[in-house]
């Protein structure tokens, strides 16, 4: 679990251009980390590539925070 969590935080920081220290499990991509809708699409694509999964558009809309991403990836890998 820790490795998935760490990798997701690294991807979020890289995709959104923020310091990894700002990325907490509770961080909302839009509200806390300044992402816009295009950023979130690119973030989902990066997660799909990293973890070799496909995230449906419906599920992608539900992934709004770092913890949402951790939970989704953990449940689907």
Curated annotation (Swiss-Prot):
InterPro entries assigned:
ACP, ACP-like_sf, PP-bd_ACP, Ppantetheine_attach_site
Domain Carrier, chain residue ranges per copy: 2-77
Protein name as annotated:
Acyl carrier protein
Query: Which of UniProt's keywords are assigned here?
Result: Cytoplasm, Fatty acid biosynthesis, Fatty acid metabolism, Lipid biosynthesis, Lipid metabolism, Phosphopantetheine, Phosphoprotein
O-(pantetheine 4'-phosphoryl)serine PTM positions: 37
Localization per Swiss-Prot or TrEMBL:
Cytoplasm
What family does the Swiss-Prot or TrEMBL record give for this protein? Belongs to the acyl carrier protein (ACP) family.
Q: What's the chief localization of this chain? A: cytoplasm
- Entry annotated with the keyword Acetylation: no
What Gene3D superfamilies is this protein classified in? ACP-like (1.10.1200.10)
Which domain of life does the UniProt lineage start with?
A: Bacteria
Q: Name one Pfam family in it.
A: PP-binding
Q: Where are the transmembrane segments?
A: none
| GO biological process: one example | lipid A biosynthetic process
One GO CC term of this entry? membrane
Pathway info: Lipid metabolism; fatty acid biosynthesis
PTM note: 4'-phosphopantetheine is transferred from CoA to a specific serine of apo-ACP by AcpS. This modification is essential for activity because fatty acids are bound in thioester linkage to the sulfhydryl of the prosthetic group.
Is Magnesium among this UniProt entry's keywords?
Answer: no
Chain's gene name: acpP
What Gene Ontology terms describe what this protein does at the molecular function level?
Answer: acyl binding; acyl carrier activity
The record describes the protein's role as: Carrier of the growing fatty acid chain in fatty acid biosynthesis.
């Amino acid at each position: 679990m820790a490795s998935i969590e760490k990798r997701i935080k690294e991807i979020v920081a890289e995709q959104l251009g923020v310091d990894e220290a700002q990325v907490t499990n509770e961080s909302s991509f839009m509200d806390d980390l300044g992402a816009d809708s295009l950023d979130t699409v690119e973030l989902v694509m990066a997660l799909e590539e990293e973890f070799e999964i496909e995230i449906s558009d419906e599920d992608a809309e539900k992934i709004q925070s770092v913890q949402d991403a951790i939970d989704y990836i953990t449940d689907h890998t």
